[in-house]
UniProtKB/Swiss-Prot annotation:
Protein name listed in UniProt: Sphingosine kinase 2
Phenotypic consequence of D552A: No effect on cleavage and secretion in apoptotic cells. No effect on kinase activity
Gene for this chain: SPHK2
Primary localization class, coarse: cytoplasm
Organism from which the protein derives: Homo sapiens (Human)
Residues that bear Phosphoserine: S387, S393, S399, S419, S421, S477
Length: 654
């Protein structure tokens, strides 16, 4: 027993393996990234068997199984000691799989090889939980032959997860797999309710390690820290930038990319978002695009992490917003005026509640409902999209209120910008890891780290397993390692990391680069005759790009990431508080346009101008308050790239 425990401990202490993290050798050009992010070939029929075989279990004294791999799932049927008439839990959808690896026994006399899959199925209460399953390849007399069979299955499964084609009649070997992508993770450790770093460490990092992705990680420390970093980033060394926070951090990243002299190349860098903030609108849209049911909190994070592990980019529209002072910024989400922006900014003091702050802010806003006089002008879309009334309403997300964290002790530091620091959680601020860092992240145990499913799912055995040394990146060996925090100074970032050294005079203001707004005349000048103008008293005006205004608010249910449209929604004065509340309740299902509210208006546009005529008010861009006054905006279709998972992956959940 002592030997077994010691072996398991040694397994957890195995050294990091080098993750080069590229989709090919040499610098990463836009062409290389485009090929890597290209949509996969048309999928095979979901029921077409790709592989079939008989395997044992781990430990060896367990039952035996017949495995069948299709393009959508791994089918498992127990053969011995007692065949199953009706297999229970014998279907593992690939939509729930983060990755797989091959393993070998530490016993020299064991000629079997093993492959392990990492899954995140839903439990009885609907929440996801991590589970592993390990299968024993023992049909051949030698370890080399059994290892080849285990690698064949692991390679085929990985190809399906990443949308890579399998050879029709060719041999399936690890050579089919490209080198793993290298991601830069930017984490706001105080995001949302102060859980961002905890969730990143406990859920995100293990999952992307299981997927075999290479990553480096840095925690943001101040306002516009992320913007400064990406402004000087060596883009050729990275295949994607992923923010672990709310919508505000991605706003900084995109504006930093567009503020570079090489913005035309920089804006094509794939970006992703893993929701750990209080405002997770884009993540809600990604979740819906991936086919998952609406979710909040940790469940939404796990859904988006699964999609990130699958890879795959999607064109992303970006809105260029010119403010009254002439400065310009870029939006991927929304421009709001009136009730929505009032709630967003005035609910700041309730940020510790997470997304529930908006519910409370809405109730308080209804109690003091204001109207604003203004003028909205827009250039109608050349081709109008389908009616904004959805064919059917979307299901509501489960409540996040049960995920309230323990209160964190206060920390003595100056307040930071809302997109950088939301709660004073006392956590270290490590710098980005360099290759060969001596302090690796905790290694995942082979058969645990999370709850196991009951029954035939793998458990600890008498002969612990170790990673197959011939595989490029077994799970649990992330390249990212966290340095000790640097006191009172800027983090030391090695030149090999591909990151710029932060400088005090880095530009953090409005963007001076980016595409020209050829549809917009200068602010204050007359608009062309083909524009439509509305003037009057409004309760709110919202210009939104994706479908979601919040993780559980579907403001434009028909919107797509690359439809080239800005979706204008407004509510005129005269609406009652009860009717406005009904609109927002219906927005949780995306059915608010079907209520027939006479004050609710909608238009699809390519550009718009908003001129507030009320002397006081609040304007927000992507949830961030901007200067109050006239503004105008133009949509630039598909100039960005968003990591969303492969098209059509996964199918709508049952």
């Amino acid at each position: 027993m002592n030997g077994h425990l010691e072996a398991e401990e040694q397994q957890d202490q195995r050294p990091d393996q080098e993750l080069t993290g590229s989709w090919g050798h040499g610098p990463r050009s836009t062409l290389v990234r485009a090929k890597a992010m290209a949509p996969p070939p048309p999928p095979l029929a979901a029921s077409t068997p790709l592989l079939h075989g008989e395997f044992g279990s781990y430990p060896a004294r367990g039952p035996r199984f017949a495995l069948t791999l299709t393009s959508q799932a791994l089918h498992i049927q127990r053969l011995r000691p007692k065949p199953e008439a009706r297999p229970r839990g014998g279907l593992v959808p690939l939509a729930e799989v983060s990755g797989c690896c091959t393993l070998r026994s530490r016993s020299p006399s064991d000629s079997a090889a093993y492959f392990c899959i990492y899954t995140y199925p839903r439990g009885r209460r609907g929440a996801r939980r991590r589970a592993t399953r390990t299968f024993r390849a023992d049909g051949a007399a030698t370890y080399e032959e059994n290892r080849a069979e285990a690698q064949r299955w692991a390679t085929a499964l990985t190809c399906l997860l990443r949308g890579l084609p399998l050879p029709g009649d060719g041999e399936i070997t690890p050579d089919l797999l490209p080198r793993p992508p290298r991601l830069l993770l930017l984490v706001n450790p105080f995001g949302g309710r102060g859980l961002a770093w905890q969730w990143c460490k406990n859920h995100v990092l293990p999952m992307i390690s299981e997927a075999g992705l290479s990553f480096n990680l840095i925690q943001t420390e101040r306002q516009n820290h992320a913007r400064e970093l990406v402004q000087g980033l060596s883009l050729s060394e990275w295949d994607g930038i992923v923010t672990v926070s709310g919508d505000g951090l991605l706003h900084e990243v995109l504006n930093g990319l567009l503020d570079r002299p090489d913005w035309e190349e920089a804006v094509k860098m794939p970006v992703g978002i893993l929701p750990c903030g209080s405002g997770n609108a884009l993540a809600g849209a990604v979740n819906q695009h991936g086919g998952f049911e609406p979710a909040l909190g940790l469940d939404l994070l796990l859904n988006c992490s699964l999609l990130l592990c699958r890879g795959g980019g999607h064109p992303l529209d970006l809105l260029s917003v010119t403010l009254a002072s002439g400065s310009r910024c870029f939006s991927f989400l929304s421009v709001a005026w009136g009730f929505v922006s009032d709630v967003d900014i005035q609910s700041e003091r309730f940020r510790a509640l997470g997304s529930a702050r908006f519910t409370l802010g809405t109730v308080l806003g209804l109690a003091t409902l204001h109207t604003y006089r203004g003028r909205l002008s827009y250039l109608p879309a050349t081709v109008e999209p389908a009616s904004p009334t959805p064919a059917h309403s979307l299901p509501r997300a489960k409540s996040e209120l049960t995920l309230t964290p323990d209160p964190a002790p206060p920390m003595a530091h100056s307040p930071l910008h809302r997109s950088v620091s939301d709660l004073p959680l006392p956590l270290p601020q490590p710098a980005l890891a360099s290759p060969g860092s001596p302090e690796p992240l905790p290694i995942l145990s082979l058969n645990g780290g999370g709850p196991e499913l009951a029954g035939d799912w793998g458990g600890a055995g008498d002969a612990p397993l170790s990673p197959d040394p011939l595989l490029s990146s077994p799970p649990g060996s992330p390249k990212a390692a966290l340095h000790s925090p640097v006191s009172e100074g800027a983090p030391v970032i090695p030149p090999s990391s591909g990151l710029p050294l932060p400088t005090p005079d880095a530009r953090v203001g409005a963007s001076t680069c980016g595409p020209p707004d050829h549809l917009l005349p200068p602010l204050g000048t007359p608009l062309p005759p083909d524009w439509v103008t509305l003037e009057g008293d409004f309760v709110l005006m919202l210009a939104i790009s994706p479908s979601h205004l919040g993780a559980d608010l579907v403001a434009a249910p028909h919107a797509r990431f690359d439809d080239g449209l800005v979706h204008l929604c407004w509510v005129r004065s005269g609406i009652s508080r009860a009717a406005l509340l009904r609109l927002f309740l219906a927005m949780e299902r995306g059915s608010h346009f079907s209520l027939g509210c006479p004050q609710l208006g909608y238009a699809a546009a390519r550009a718009f101008r908003l001129e507030p005529l009320t002397p006081r008010g609040v304007l927000t861009v992507d949830g961030e308050q901007v200067e109050y006054g006239p503004l105008q905006a133009q949509m630039h279709p598909g100039i960005g790239t968003l990591l969303t998972g492969p098209p059509g992956c996964p199918g709508r959940e049952p």
